[in-house]
Structure formats: structure tokens, C-alpha cells
Swiss-Prot record:
<dbReference type="InterPro" id="IPR002583">
    <property type="entry name" value="Ribosomal_bS20"/>
</dbReference>
<protein>
    <recommendedName>
        <fullName>Small ribosomal subunit protein bS20</fullName>
    </recommendedName>
</protein>
<comment type="similarity">
    <text>Belongs to the bacterial ribosomal protein bS20 family.</text>
</comment>
<dbReference type="InterPro" id="IPR036510">
    <property type="entry name" value="Ribosomal_bS20_sf"/>
</dbReference>
<dbReference type="GO" id="GO:0070181">
    <property type="term" value="F:small ribosomal subunit rRNA binding"/>
</dbReference>
<keyword id="KW-0689">Ribosomal protein</keyword>
<keyword id="KW-0694">RNA-binding</keyword>
<keyword id="KW-0699">rRNA-binding</keyword>
<dbReference type="GO" id="GO:0005829">
    <property type="term" value="C:cytosol"/>
</dbReference>
<comment type="function">
    <text>Binds directly to 16S ribosomal RNA.</text>
</comment>
<dbReference type="Pfam" id="PF01649">
    <property type="entry name" value="Ribosomal_S20p"/>
</dbReference>
<dbReference type="GO" id="GO:0003735">
    <property type="term" value="F:structural constituent of ribosome"/>
</dbReference>
<keyword id="KW-0687">Ribonucleoprotein</keyword>
<dbReference type="GO" id="GO:0006412">
    <property type="term" value="P:translation"/>
</dbReference>
<dbReference type="GO" id="GO:0015935">
    <property type="term" value="C:small ribosomal subunit"/>
</dbReference>
Length: 90
């Protein structure tokens, strides 16, 4: 444990930020998982869940939790997953 007052404060701040970031990452993972399940089962609300997942990813990007390239990659992969399930196999 740190003995210096400023380091104690910075550790506390880092712990709060880590908890906040982990909560945001968890929301993103849950939204993606729900969207993928809806796409796989061809649920009626799949477009809403895809939009919600895109929104959560964009929020994480704007808050600095995800790098812009990582956020774009996640969105792209979700769209690719949706397109492979919705287009008929030829």
C-alpha cells in the first residue's frame, strides 16, 4: 500500500475508473451477445438489438474505453455476422 497521500488518492481514482470501464465493457459484451442470439434465432427484434449493440460500442469509444479501431472492428464483425446469417447460402 502506498504511503504518500497523492498516491493513495491516485490509486483510489484508478480503482474507480477500472470499475467504470469494466461495467462499460460488460454492457458491450452483453449487448453483442444478445444481438448474436437474436440473429441466430431469427428473432423479430434483431434490428433493435443490433442498433443497441452499435450504440453501446460507440458510447464505449466516445468515453475512451475502446480505441476507435477496436470499436469499428467490433461493429464490423457484428455486421458481418448479421449478414452471413440473413443472406441465403448460395
Amino acid at each position: 500500500m502506498a504511503n504518500i497521500k497523492s498516491k493513495i488518492k491516485s490509486i483510489t481514482k484508478m480503482q474507480k475508473a477500472r470499475a467504470r470501464n469494466n461495467a462499460i465493457k460488460s454492457r458491450v459484451k452483453t449487448a453483442i451477445k444478445k444481438a448474436k442470439i437474436a440473429i441466430s434465432t431469427d428473432a423479430s427484434n434483431k434490428s433493435d438489438l443490433i442498433a443497441k449493440a452499435h450504440s453501446e460500442i460507440s458510447k464505449a469509444k466516445s468515453k475512451g474505453v475502446f480505441h476507435k479501431n477496436k470499436a469499428n472492428r467490433k461493429i464490423s464483425r457484428l455486421n458481418l455476422f448479421a449478414n452471413t446469417y440473413t443472406t441465403p447460402a448460395q
